Amino acid sequence: MAGNTFGKLFTLSTFGESHGIAIGGVIDGCPPGLEISEADLQVDLDRRKPGTSRYTTARREEDEVQILSGVFEGKTTGTSIGLLIKNTDQRSNDYSKIKDTFRPGHADYTYQQKYGLRDYRGGGRSSARETAIRVAAGGVAKKFLKTHLGIEVRGYLSKLGPIKIDKVDHSVTNTNAFFCPDESKLEALDDYMRDLKKQGDSIGAKVSVVATNMPVGLGEPIFDRLDADLAHAMMGINAVKGVEVGDGFDTVEQKGSEHRDLMSADGFKSNRSGGVLGGISSGQDLVVHMALKPTSSISVPGESIDINGETAEVVTKGRHDPCVGIRAVPIAEAMMALVLMDHYLRHRGQNADVQSITPVIPAQSK
């Protein structure tokens, strides 16, 4: 099965299934000398892990990461970093009734047709359970970016169903179960999710990720543009159906005189481009948004087929997130960090000695 490795110089290869013994990953390309510990990685894993609120799946996994290699006396050695997270709360019997039936909207049918068989327990390899390792690996990248470059990556919920969140206060985001940056929206979110759970249904969401203190120059045109790789990374997250950089699809209604980010000696006048021009970071905040579909694992009956092609009714049991977008916030942060780490190393390898006669202008003032 191909497609398990991400990145060019800073790479992550993952393995494992939802109801297997464990999930794991191997990071290659991390520079030596980075101070890192399991506690560093656990911070974001605790933000992502299931069973921490009534708005997410009841599956309870401690998600305690083990660093198996590549770290000695608290510092990276420059060799492969092995990561492992054991699965401890599987309930495979919850899926016994669907082992011969395809859940509509899931990867059951496509995995069966591609490989001729599938691990039906919790979705197997297609489950978002795998993303825990991405979050752990992203913790390594985030630590390097922050300590060596001053780059900080932060995500938040920007829309859940019909509830739009415009105000962004990053100090609020991690104080609530929704990763919502606007405290005034919490009651509405809570009421909406309570009603949704009573209906046995699910809802989609929009998640935004921002990297601040960005340098100019990250991105490898033509085919490995920074925004192209970010879109690739975000689309690789389970349930993501759309990605925007900067103003994204809103640019359809903008005129050129409105959209272009004007510049002066004092800096940029706006950031509609989301911090990327020509596939290269401009030094402005890097802004990415992604849309996540509602999960199809719901108790509302739905029509499907079985492995023999016969019509069947499906009612999904088991423990599932009524809105997968909520726990996607730390996952999106991790994927952005992995992309930035990879592009920083690529830029350093080719252009470390490049000097431009043009001064770097400031990002748009907040």
Curated annotation (Swiss-Prot):
Q: Where does FMN bind?
A: R125, S126, S127, N238, A239, G278, K293, P294, T295, S296, S297, R319
For this UniProt record, give its keywords in alphabetical order, as a comma-separated list: Amino-acid biosynthesis, Aromatic amino acid biosynthesis, FAD, Flavoprotein, FMN, Lyase, NADP
| GO BP annotations listed | amino acid biosynthetic process; aromatic amino acid family biosynthetic process; chorismate biosynthetic process
Keyword check for Ion transport = no
| Region forming the signal peptide | none
Listed under catalytic activity are:
5-O-(1-carboxyvinyl)-3-phosphoshikimate = chorismate + phosphate
EC number, as in UniProt: 4.2.3.5
Taxonomy, superkingdom = Bacteria
Co-factor note (free text): Reduced FMN (FMNH(2)).
Q: Which residues bind NADP(+)?
A: R48, R54
User: Needs which cofactor?
Assistant: FMNH2
User: May I have one GO cellular component term?
Assistant: cytosol
Q: In which pathway does it act?
A: Metabolic intermediate biosynthesis; chorismate biosynthesis; chorismate from D-erythrose 4-phosphate and phosphoenolpyruvate: step 7/7
Q: What class of enzyme is it?
A: lyase
InterPro entries membership: Chorismate_synth, Chorismate_synth_AroC_sf, Chorismate_synthase_CS
Gene Ontology molecular functions? chorismate synthase activity; FMN binding
- Which NCBIfam families does the record match to this protein? aroC, PRK05382.1
What family does this belong to? Belongs to the chorismate synthase family.
The record describes its quaternary structure and partners as: Homotetramer.
Entry function: This reaction introduces a second double bond into the aromatic ring system.
Entry protein name? Chorismate synthase
Encoding gene (name):
aroC
